[in-house]
Amino acid sequence: NKPSRKVVAEDNGQSIEIVCTEALPFKTSTDNAPVYYYLENVMDAGTRLYGNGGLKYRAAENASAVNDVRNDLWYVTGNAFDGLQFHSVGTEDVAKSYAALSTSTSLTAGSHLLGYNDMWFVYRISDSTFGIHAYSGFNRKYLAWHMEDSKSEVTFGEPGKSDAFAFRMVEPTFTFPMYNGGDGNVYNTFAAPFDVALADDNVKMYKGSVNTAIHELTLSQVDAAPANAGVMLLGENSSANEVTLKAVSGVAALEGNSLVGITGELSDLTGKLILGISDQTGAVGFFTAGSSV
């Protein structure tokens, strides 16, 4: 917000306090408490920026695997007055340009640049979109992020308000399949290498405590799950074939949770309890070759 008032003759020699507040279309973070987003350019309904060993671009669609969602995440530190840093979780680095910022350089999120600029300022384009720019001492002007028509790189140009300059921070949601249990409910198990929370009301999330003596699983509802924790997803009286989740941070450990999260493929299922449907009773439960819970 820009405070203003008329300066009058009586102000001569007086100290005037000007209070400025920032109104950003996203929440800023600290390194210890990141607020995650997808970072998108609005061209063609959204071109997402993501880092996986470098700065790359793809259409705003679900990652091919849940584990890969982590590479899409961004968070922003700093403030509107001193400058902002855009952090790529995938590269564990910040978006940067060469120190001599010019229209012949491009944006990167890697650590290989010798001498670079990584502090940015934003300007309003719409209620939800903004431009990102920095002052170029080399060009003696501000230069802004600009998505190339090929969407293969972000370069720099004099600040504009077309879609090529318009970026937005989007809630980092993704979908995960649910399976019909034949009893009017839908089920699945879930684990991810990052903290997650539910983003819709179709399905509930549960931790599970196993009593091996009597082969009983007790479910307790939770709102979110920390990285690598196993949880049960259950939609009662539902035919939903997917659930929407979102990446978050700061989720505490699930006390008493017996469900083990596996984020890779298993080739040996010996001794593992797997969610399924009994071919004898049709009941949904966790099964091994010789027992069930």
Predicted regions and their residues:
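Extracellular glycan-recognition/adhesion modules and their associated mucin-like linkers
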Residues: 16-54, 68-104, 119-150, 159-173
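A short, surface-exposed interaction/processing loop segment used at functional sites
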Residues: 106-114, 150-160, 292-293
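Acidic, glycine-rich flexible loop segments
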Residues: 108-139, 266-292
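Surface-exposed interfaces of beta-sheet-rich extracellular modules
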Residues: 1-5
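A short, polar beta-strand/turn micro-motif
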Residues: 22-30, 169-199, 221-293
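Short secondary-structure capping micro-motifs at structural edges
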Residues: 73-74, 82-85, 210-223, 227-230
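Extended, compositionally biased repeat/scaffold regions that form elongated interaction surfaces
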Residues: 119-120, 196-215, 271-276
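Short, flexible beta-strand-to-coil junctions
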Residues: 39-45, 87-94, 102-104, 134-139, ...
